[in-house]
């Protein structure tokens, strides 16, 4: 499998018809073969790459430029869960949400869930502490994507099990 992250330049902002590939980052040597999600901090000096059962944190030498030097910082081990498919941070990086798919092994500890972590320091995985999990199996047993509205009071989940996309109020 070609596990890589591709960077495209858009000569007109938000216009994909102007896209051109400018860089391909091969999967870091310490990674598995299942990167599905990538997030940057707000100023682009950190990148977070989902790597199967963990989230890896890297410093980026030049903001939002994956062709610059990436330095491994830390990871959040998630091996107790089945498979991370997506992640989202709060705007200030003090809350991290991880979306997981259920396994097919009959072990109900690996249901489709959103895991919430608080980060004492924004966008710093070494300060992460578990808060809670929210089960979404009844709405979507094979979730793939997670997003929040700008107020953070609605979460949107997409998936592939044939159920409709759902959005739930966040209390």
Q: Which residues fall in each region the model found?
A:
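A short loop-to-beta-strand structural motif that recurs across blades of beta-propeller domains
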Residues: 4-7, 54-57, 112-116, 169-171
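Short glycine/acidic-enriched loop and turn motifs that connect beta-strands
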Residues: 2-4, 54-55, 102-108, 161-166
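A short beta-strand motif characteristic of beta-propeller blades
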Residues: 20-29, 71-78, 129-137
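Short loop/turn segments immediately following beta-strands, especially the blade-tip
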Residues: 8-17, 57-67, 117-126
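Residue-level detector of Asp-centered blade-edge/turn motifs that repeat once per structural unit
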Residues: 40-43, 91-92, 148-151
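Residue-level marker for isolated small/hydroxyl-bearing positions within beta-strands
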Residues: 50, 99-101, 158
């Amino acid at each position: 499998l070609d596990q890589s992250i591709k960077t495209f330049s858009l000569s007109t902002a938000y216009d994909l018809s102007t896209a051109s590939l400018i860089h391909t980052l091969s999967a870091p040597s310490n990674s598995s073969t299942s990167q599905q999600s990538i997030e940057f901090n707000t100023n682009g000096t950190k990148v977070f790459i989902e790597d199967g059962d963990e989230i890896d944190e890297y410093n980026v030498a030049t903001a939002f430029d994956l062709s610059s030097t990436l330095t491994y910082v830390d990871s959040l081990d998630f091996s107790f869960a089945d498979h991370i498919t997506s992640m989202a941070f709060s705007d200030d990086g003090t809350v991290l949400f991880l979306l997981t798919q259920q396994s097919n092994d009959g072990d109900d500890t690996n249901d489709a869930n959103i895991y919430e972590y608080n980060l004492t320091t924004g966008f710093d995985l070494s300060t992460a502490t578990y808060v809670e999990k929210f089960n979404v199996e009844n709405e979507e047993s094979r979730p793939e994507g997670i997003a929040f509205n700008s107020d953070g009071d609605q979460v949107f989940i997409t998936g592939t099990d044939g159920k409709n996309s759902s959005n739930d109020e966040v209390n």
